[in-house]
Amino acid sequence: TKPLVGVFMNQPAQHVSEIMSILRLDYLQFHGSESYEYCKSFNTPFIKTIHIGSDKIFVDKILIKNASMTLFDTQLCDQKGGTGTRFDWSKLISEQPLQEIIKTGKYLVAGGLNLDNINDLLVTYKPKGLDVSSGLEHETGKKDHEKMERFVDIVRTNDS
């Protein structure tokens, strides 16, 4: 079976623990300003998000070193993730703290992924995984099954 991932952003630890016990999560994915101590306190593998915008990118090296994976996502002003907008992927190889993460191969990419750009991302940057949502919708909140199938086909073609 595929791993079950719970996605959280600055939630109280009690809330995360309750969701974990109900759903028996395999991974926790943190999108906020969660500390290393907080993330490790659940004794569950975790994915930590680094939000990439126009400002300097801050990377908590201890937190990222201990994460099972790092997720790179777009930040627009104060909105972290869920923007449907792609960040400048060249930062993955031009920004020093991100280069180190890329070298490990333990990273996922989110933010503005769609049928028009996914092949370029996969060929150029080779992420371990993808987090896609609005790029596969025909209207807000409604997934387009044809787009989803085509997207998966592109990913599988690049994975072989």
Over which residues does each language-model region extend?
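Short loop-to-alpha-helix "cap/lid" segments that border enzyme active sites
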Residues: 33-134, 138-160
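N-terminal active-site wall of soluble small-molecule enzyme domains
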Residues: 1-44
